[in-house]
Amino acid sequence: MKKIIKHMFEEKEDFYEYLHMYKECTDPIAKGELRKIAEEELHHYKHLYDIAFGKADVEHMSMLEHGVHEYATNVYHDMLKKLEVK
């Protein structure tokens, strides 16, 4: 599970990097490609999130697991929100 979560947060960093480039880009074609890449990173993050927490019993998680789950959920919602802004 640690490897999955580590990979999730690598995807998160990649997402924000591509999102930043997308927002700074002035070329319409490149901007479209950067957005597609950011969307792919979001999809990868969500896939890993589902693997890590999809069948998790939230009521029986340790404090650490619960904290990581809550943080990962908040990150996912932030990513969705930021990608909506064009």
Predicted features, each with a name:
Residues 1-86:
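Non-heme di-metal
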